[in-house]
Structures are given as C-alpha cells and as structure tokens.
A protein has these predicted regions:
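Acidic, divalent-metal-binding catalytic cores of TOPRIM
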Residues: 1-185
Length: 185
C-alpha cells in the first residue's frame, strides 16, 4: 500500500486484488477507524475520498498494453504478447487462485489466443499482476525504472485513467494544478 502524505491531506492507493472496489474501500476505512480506537497515536482519518482502489488486480497490470510493449521492445510484436500470455495461461496461470477466480468470472476456461484478446480487460482486473509482470518484465530488472518511465510516456492516457482521474480530483492536486495554470499565464 502506498501513501502520499501532504500535511493533513493524503491519498491512499491500494491494489484491487480482483475484488469489489467499493467493499475494499469500506474495509480499509473501517480498519483505520478501528486502529484509531486502539492506538495512542492518532492516525489521520481515512475517508472514502482519501482512498483509491485500483481498477486492476495490481499496479503492474497497468503495464500490459501490447502495442506499447512492442514499441519498447519488451515483446517482438503484439501477437507475440498474446501468444506468450496464452502459453503461460495453459502452463500455470489458470491454476493460480486468481486464475481460477478469473475462469469463474468469465464462466469458461480460456482455450485460445482469441479468448485472451477478447478478455484482456478481465485478465488485468482478476489475474494476479506480479505473475504476469515477471513473465514480460522479469528480464529487465536492471533497466526497470527507465523502461517503466518510457512506458508511461508512450502509453495513452486512458491506460492510466482511473489513477490520473483520481489524482486530478484530489483537492491537493487540484489546487497545485490551478497554481501551475496561474504561473503559465
């Protein structure tokens, strides 16, 4: 869990873990409310507007746009991305608890590359990202930071829209944006 504290304003970001985002947010708020009752040190009040539950299972799942990955050289082609993912699905991903949950959500076991292509959004929401990430990015550990920065620069805004929209609407960032706009004028 990552927290950005800015005086008494903060934004807590949590992986979606393939679960109901609203319920995860409520659980997180209740957890911190309970901790405040038990601890001597007062923690800041965690309210729903301070919590962003990621749309995807984990942050890593935001980095699986085959077109961008091809442009970066992470995969040879978009088709190679889907072929590799399907190969790993058949090999072991379908046996993971998140893979079983994905199959349950879909109502069928994926049997082809076209199934992978058709359900990429569900894969990013319900399949554990750490496993997927290592398949494609594991060999780039030494260049990881640079590679991810380049990925973010190349990716369309909509790939990160739930994160960027939440930040855009967060009070601290809205006021900073207004300050920056004033400086530009």
């Amino acid at each position: 869990m990552n927290q950005i504290y800015l005086r008494d304003q903060f934004l807590m970001i949590r992986d979606g873990d393939g679960k109901d985002r609203m319920e995860l947010g409520r659980q997180l708020c209740r957890y911190y409310e309970q901790r405040n009752l038990e601890d001597v040190d007062t923690l800041p009040k965690v309210r729903p507007e301070n919590v962003l539950i990621l749309k995807y299972y984990s942050f890593e799942n935001y980095f699986f746009n085959p077109k961008v990955m091809t442009e970066l050289g992470v995969v040879k082609s978009e088709e190679a991305f889907y072929e590799t993912l399907f190969e790993k699905w058949k090999e072991y991903l379908h046996r993971l608890s998140s893979g079983k949950h994905l199959t349950e959500v879909l109502g069928f076991e994926m049997q082809s590359i076209s199934d992978i292509k058709a359900h990429m959004e569900e894969i990013k929401i319900y399949l554990r990202g750490h496993n997927l990430y290592d398949i494609f990015y594991g060999r780039y550990k030494d260049q990881e930071e640079e590679l991810l920065k380049r990925y973010i620069d190349l990716a369309p805004r909509e790939d990160f829209s739930d994160i960027l929209d939440a930040i855009d609407h967060f009070i601290y960032f809205e006021s900073r944006k207004r300050e920056m706009e004033k400086k530009v004028k």
